[in-house]
Amino acid sequence: MARLAAFDMDGTLLMPDHQLGRETIATLSRLRERDITLTFATGRHVLEMRHILGTLSLDAYLITGNGTRIHSLEGDVLYRQDLDPQVADTVMHHAWDTGASMHVFNDNGWFTGQEIPALLQAHVYSGFRYQVIDIKSIPAHQVMKICFCGDHDSLIRLRIQLNETLEERAHLCFSAVDCLEVLPLGCNKGSALAVLSDHLGLSLADCMAFGDAMNDREMLGSVGQGLIMGNAMPQLIAALPHLSVIGHCGHQAVSHFLTHWLDNPHLPYSPE
């Protein structure tokens, strides 16, 4: 039986309205009662995740910023990695040929250059929000990640520009169809989970993980049991064809799967 369960948030543990369902919260509590370590592995900021954890009364490790930070149960930093300052400076100051909006994250929060109220819908549960600022004024040596938000086709074109300019100095991934992330080289949820599991005296084989987007690929592919959401990006399902696909986040499929796993561990699981 797995000893650690790692969960992506958006599109996985959270429902489409960006909230946790009652069944999901109850199932997470059951996991803790079985002494299974909980880990939330997300692109969201630790400041936001601490607020969410506080409303749940659950002990969980946090992998935030898509693997750029790991925090202990007590809130201590176990691991941190920032973008190479030259990479951050280039991305923030270059005139990219795109209509996508740029978002910069550091330990102080989420920063963008203009008001985009629609993006706050994903954060109604926590109240976390961006700060509007001149992005070029942000110190390049304190940036954990940079995101671009826009339609998928424009982000694909932007990814080509970023790859040509940055070459092999950063890790690019889609955390959603409308969000392209620029991360430190070698930084992802999978590598962060490897650091955390080693810290806990576990192996990745002792872990299970759930996810729906390409920023979950390394994590899902490296654990003992990786589960893909039924609402996942098609690219993720194609990249990991050997993994099981469960139900939709809107149906609290993670809770559905885990309830079966806890109650009938030796019986095959049938998705909703």
Curated annotation (Swiss-Prot):
SUPFAM superfamilies: HAD-like
Function text: Catalyzes the hydrolysis of 4-amino-2-methyl-5-hydroxymethylpyrimidine pyrophosphate (HMP-PP) to 4-amino-2-methyl-5-hydroxymethylpyrimidine phosphate (HMP-P).
Keywords: Hydrolase, Magnesium, Metal-binding
Organism of derivation: Salmonella arizonae (strain ATCC BAA-731 / CDC346-86 / RSK2980)
Record flagged with keyword Electron transport: no
Broad EC category: hydrolase
Reaction equations catalysed: 4-amino-2-methyl-5-(diphosphooxymethyl)pyrimidine + H2O = 4-amino-2-methyl-5-(phosphooxymethyl)pyrimidine + phosphate + H(+)
A GO term for molecular function: 4-amino-5-hydroxymethyl-2-methylpyrimidine diphosphatase activity
EC number(s) on file: 3.6.1.-
Family: Belongs to the HAD-like hydrolase superfamily. Cof family.
Official protein name in the record: HMP-PP phosphatase
Binding site for Mg(2+): D8, D10, D212
Listed PROSITE patterns: COF_1, COF_2
Cofactor(s), names only, from the UniProt record: Mg(2+)
Catalytic-site annotation from UniProt: D8
